[in-house]
């Protein structure tokens, strides 16, 4: 096991971790976190475990606690770590802010990858053209003979790839404004395509949106 994966295990083992939603990337991470010794709570607006369809069997098998329905954010209380998704727009709302004030670590799959990734990271953000730019940069590195790990807002979840990442590789990551809200680690190279007034229904104003991208 690489030392970066060991550091991740040290962060997770024995901790109470709440996941907001069970999207594709979170399903992979939930299993990994349980295997690393975390006590996982899944917070979701669904009303019962049966509403998760085929994933209900995995929830039972892994022994995941559930905080469901209208008050699903109550599951934040008493957690050591909260794993948010890019689609969760309640970052500045009271439940999450109260959790952070109580000392809970709020992070995401891509943020943890930034924290523990041993190779250089090229990050691409902006309002338009992110996916095209990210894809082209990845192709350039591949043509130069580098092993590329492509992810973020494009491709697969990056954190489960961590054991396969070596210092000689390069990670090319697409980031949305929602993913940037709580980012505290910087990439080695940052690319901003442009910033236009998108998603102002989820950001306070254009100034906040612009500052997030810087």
Language model: regions and residue ranges:
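N-terminal leader/targeting and accessory segments in enzymes
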Residues: 1-108, 112
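Accessible peptide chain termini
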Residues: 1, 212-214
């Amino acid at each position: 096991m690489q030392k970066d994966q060991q550091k991740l295990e040290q962060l997770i083992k024995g901790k109470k971790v709440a996941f907001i939603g069970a999207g594709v990337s979170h399903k992979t991470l939930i299993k990994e976190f349980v295997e690393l010794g975390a006590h996982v709570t899944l917070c979701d607006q669904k009303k019962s475990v049966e509403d998760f369809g085929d994933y209900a069997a995995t929830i039972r098998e892994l022994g995941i606690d559930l905080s469901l329905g209208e008050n699903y954010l109550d599951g934040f209380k008493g957690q050591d770590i909260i794993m948010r998704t890019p689609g969760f727009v309640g970052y500045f709302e009271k439940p999450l802010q109260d959790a952070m004030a109580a000392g809970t670590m709020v992070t995401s799959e891509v943020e943890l990858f930034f924290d523990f990734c041993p190779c250089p990271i090229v990050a691409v953000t902006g309002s338009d053209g992110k996916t095209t730019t990210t894809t082209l940069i990845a192709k350039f590195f591949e043509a130069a003979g580098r092993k590329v790990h492509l992810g973020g807002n494009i491709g697969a979840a990056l954190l489960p790839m961590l054991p396969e990442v070596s210092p000689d590789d390069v990670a090319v990551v697409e980031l949305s404004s929602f993913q940037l809200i709580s980012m505290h680690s910087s990439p080695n190279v940052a690319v901003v395509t442009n910033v236009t007034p998108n998603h102002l229904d989820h950001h306070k104003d254009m100034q906040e949106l612009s500052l997030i991208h810087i």
